[in-house]
UniProtKB/Swiss-Prot annotation:
One of its GO terms (cellular component) is cytosol. Catalyzes the oxidation of 5,10-methylenetetrahydrofolate to 5,10-methenyltetrahydrofolate and then the hydrolysis of 5,10-methenyltetrahydrofolate to 10-formyltetrahydrofolate. GO terms for molecular function: methenyltetrahydrofolate cyclohydrolase activity; methylenetetrahydrofolate dehydrogenase (NADP+) activity. One of its GO terms (biological process) is purine nucleotide biosynthetic process. Pathway: One-carbon metabolism; tetrahydrofolate interconversion. It catalyses: (6R)-5,10-methylene-5,6,7,8-tetrahydrofolate + NADP(+) = (6R)-5,10-methenyltetrahydrofolate + NADPH; (6R)-5,10-methenyltetrahydrofolate + H2O = (6R)-10-formyltetrahydrofolate + H(+). It comes from Renibacterium salmoninarum (strain ATCC 33209 / DSM 20767 / JCM 11484 / NBRC 15589 / NCIMB 2235). NADP(+) binds at residues 169-171, 196, 237. The gene is folD. This is Bifunctional protein FolD. It comes from the Bacteria. The keyword Phosphoprotein does not apply. HAMAP family: THF_DHG_CYH. Coiled coil: none annotated.
Amino acid sequence: MTAQILDGKKAAAEVKSELVERIAALVARGITPGLATVLVGDDAPSQSYVRMKHQDANALGLASFERHLPAETSQDELDAVIDELNANPGVHGILVQIPLPKHLDEQAVLERIDPDKDADGLHPVNLGRLVLNVNGVITSPLPCTPVGAIQLMLRNGIELAGKHVVVVGRGITVGRALGLLLTRREINATVTLTHTGTVDLAAHLRQADVVISAVGVAHMIKAENLKPGVVVLDVGVSRERDEVTGKSKLLGDVAPDVADVASWISPNPGGVGPMTRALLMSNVVQAAEAVSSR
């Protein structure tokens, strides 16, 4: 068996195409959706991620607000930047690029963002709304990467209702939110949330219809621990030095041999990543629409 590819770039292009008409309607009413990013320090991967997000925003005609602060920025200085963006009516979505330098309190920073401008969907208020709402429509921002992973499957005709999904990774950004989204009645999957401390992880993986891994441990998901026909999404990112070139290269959680047993597999990069960025744009547009309806 050779797995079919879950093409994140193609699915992301579909999401962006669906946003074009909504953005045009907002602009016609005098509202241009605006994305603001805050980057602290000079971490090269973070700079790349922020650059790609603004490229997406510019391609769609969104307004861009970039705040690049030095690594020694204090908590008070960072808070002041977030307060300024919260108060700016042209900004509809704010994203603080993480990780932050160790002297800064990431959780306090995320909580300081106006929940209505929470482009990443990670504010405690918005996560709380997700916890409390199992049945109804959710109008608050949703976490981009988990929604992107689910949309990537649904847009490829993968049925999730009644399926056993094993999520590897308990982080707020992906793992915990995935469980909340997948168990909503509109999806109706059964979820096992595992992590690097799970005893006999392989036993859980062998029972899975779908595996979504987001722990950042290179190639920890191996073919020998999966049943034939499983759907596998690789969300984890780790870095390894290439012994030949001396350069750092990106590796996912999923080993190459998994493609021989899976029915579908997401590449990394090129799988969930593009969907994360597309859903970020969607959250910004949704926030602008909420403002326009007031």
